[in-house]
């Protein structure tokens, strides 16, 4: 009988800790729904004690997602654990994930606690969490740099208190595959009650080995849960990539001998959604989800693939959700045809109002752009869904601009502030700079522009531009995304989207730095 590997996604918690990747509640909900559609086993929806916003997001997701276990992180104290339990109350199935650092460096320098104090706090935290659920996970933070004897002592105690998952964290990406795999193996062999818990791996990519370490923890160590994120999103160099773990285990089932319950056809759509929301573009040569992942430039490779796909392809692009980017609709296409194509693409909208708004956007685009591709439709729906859920303190209305050779461009932007239209006019070093100056002249946000990037959604000069804007103010970093065939209009939409998030986003506590 084949074992099952549990996929624990922490995009909404650890992934969001990547600078600039912060998400609104509405964005977290959209990603959580996609993760559920993908059949992810456990979704770590956030860190309930970090902010009221995170608590609310976890609470809402817990009520909406029915087929995945919802999890909240909590430090090893009663206050955090109580907050997590309260946030998770609406869930069909939930888990409390509590942690404390166990390495000598962290205990001395960060916690300023003795090993005995850490031992006792870990034990009591799990005992308290068990009052709310029998599904409790414990992580020894910086486990890969912890003393083996002490680690065994702590883990034996928390399992005795009722921890059902033990997660070995390679917090700073220090591990290498053979050593990390043997660490998990040794723990399972030395801890007398290790059979009472599932062992899990959580690796960071600082040395580029997060996926390799995780797979070693599974193959060598016998771990049966992998903690990972979509696109490998995460602090510093990122986390273990969900798509790489899943496809490695599925493609090399002959070696790993494990099943995963993931619907792999949802991998690419979810990857694109996370990229669009966070503004973190997926590198073209990224395994599984990169644009070049299934591209063959070499003539020899192309010839081989045409004769027999398995000569150079070990996976099928369609199995992970890649679809041919074909022309599907035009300006004469009706609402039913639009709705049917959305269903074929696996795209869903929450209401008829959102569908109607997206269809109107499609008709407007079809009048301006001769050829409408699947990617155009996905971009329209994604932005419309975001707009429907975004708290629109500011709303883009229109844009006009004037530019002559030898003179600074001038932009005129009309937008609404709490329903009241205002007009900003300004010059700048280029049309985008002038547009941003016009908006800032009326808003006066005092924010700093950290990132401006443009991505063509399809090919050709009529392609829609997808613009990402990243703003920072008082330590908060937010992203805004806008799409339009007019790059400057897309830029204005993205800037206003970022301002809306800056206006509504609350501060959060980073669990590793508090």
Curated annotation (Swiss-Prot):
<dbReference type="GO" id="GO:0009098">
    <property type="term" value="P:L-leucine biosynthetic process"/>
</dbReference>
<feature type="binding site">
    <location>
        <position position="202"/>
    </location>
    <ligand>
        <name>Mn(2+)</name>
    </ligand>
</feature>
<keyword id="KW-0808">Transferase</keyword>
<dbReference type="InterPro" id="IPR005671">
    <property type="entry name" value="LeuA_bact_synth"/>
</dbReference>
<dbReference type="Pfam" id="PF22617">
    <property type="entry name" value="HCS_D2"/>
</dbReference>
<comment type="similarity">
    <text>Belongs to the alpha-IPM synthase/homocitrate synthase family. LeuA type 1 subfamily.</text>
</comment>
<keyword id="KW-0479">Metal-binding</keyword>
<feature type="binding site">
    <location>
        <position position="239"/>
    </location>
    <ligand>
        <name>Mn(2+)</name>
    </ligand>
</feature>
<protein>
    <recommendedName>
        <fullName>2-isopropylmalate synthase</fullName>
        <ecNumber>2.3.3.13</ecNumber>
    </recommendedName>
</protein>
<keyword id="KW-0100">Branched-chain amino acid biosynthesis</keyword>
<dbReference type="InterPro" id="IPR036230">
    <property type="entry name" value="LeuA_allosteric_dom_sf"/>
</dbReference>
<dbReference type="Pfam" id="PF08502">
    <property type="entry name" value="LeuA_dimer"/>
</dbReference>
<keyword id="KW-0432">Leucine biosynthesis</keyword>
<comment type="subunit">
    <text>Homodimer.</text>
</comment>
<feature type="binding site">
    <location>
        <position position="204"/>
    </location>
    <ligand>
        <name>Mn(2+)</name>
    </ligand>
</feature>
<feature type="domain" description="Pyruvate carboxyltransferase">
    <location>
        <begin position="5"/>
        <end position="268"/>
    </location>
</feature>
<dbReference type="GO" id="GO:0003852">
    <property type="term" value="F:2-isopropylmalate synthase activity"/>
</dbReference>
<dbReference type="InterPro" id="IPR013785">
    <property type="entry name" value="Aldolase_TIM"/>
</dbReference>
<dbReference type="InterPro" id="IPR002034">
    <property type="entry name" value="AIPM/Hcit_synth_CS"/>
</dbReference>
<dbReference type="GO" id="GO:0005829">
    <property type="term" value="C:cytosol"/>
</dbReference>
<keyword id="KW-0963">Cytoplasm</keyword>
<feature type="region of interest" description="Regulatory domain">
    <location>
        <begin position="395"/>
        <end position="514"/>
    </location>
</feature>
<comment type="pathway">
    <text>Amino-acid biosynthesis; L-leucine biosynthesis; L-leucine from 3-methyl-2-oxobutanoate: step 1/4.</text>
</comment>
<dbReference type="InterPro" id="IPR054691">
    <property type="entry name" value="LeuA/HCS_post-cat"/>
</dbReference>
<dbReference type="InterPro" id="IPR000891">
    <property type="entry name" value="PYR_CT"/>
</dbReference>
<comment type="function">
    <text>Catalyzes the condensation of the acetyl group of acetyl-CoA with 3-methyl-2-oxobutanoate (2-ketoisovalerate) to form 3-carboxy-3-hydroxy-4-methylpentanoate (2-isopropylmalate).</text>
</comment>
<dbReference type="GO" id="GO:0030145">
    <property type="term" value="F:manganese ion binding"/>
</dbReference>
<dbReference type="InterPro" id="IPR050073">
    <property type="entry name" value="2-IPM_HCS-like"/>
</dbReference>
<dbReference type="InterPro" id="IPR013709">
    <property type="entry name" value="2-isopropylmalate_synth_dimer"/>
</dbReference>
<dbReference type="GO" id="GO:0003985">
    <property type="term" value="F:acetyl-CoA C-acetyltransferase activity"/>
</dbReference>
<dbReference type="Pfam" id="PF00682">
    <property type="entry name" value="HMGL-like"/>
</dbReference>
<keyword id="KW-0464">Manganese</keyword>
<feature type="binding site">
    <location>
        <position position="14"/>
    </location>
    <ligand>
        <name>Mn(2+)</name>
    </ligand>
</feature>
<keyword id="KW-0028">Amino-acid biosynthesis</keyword>
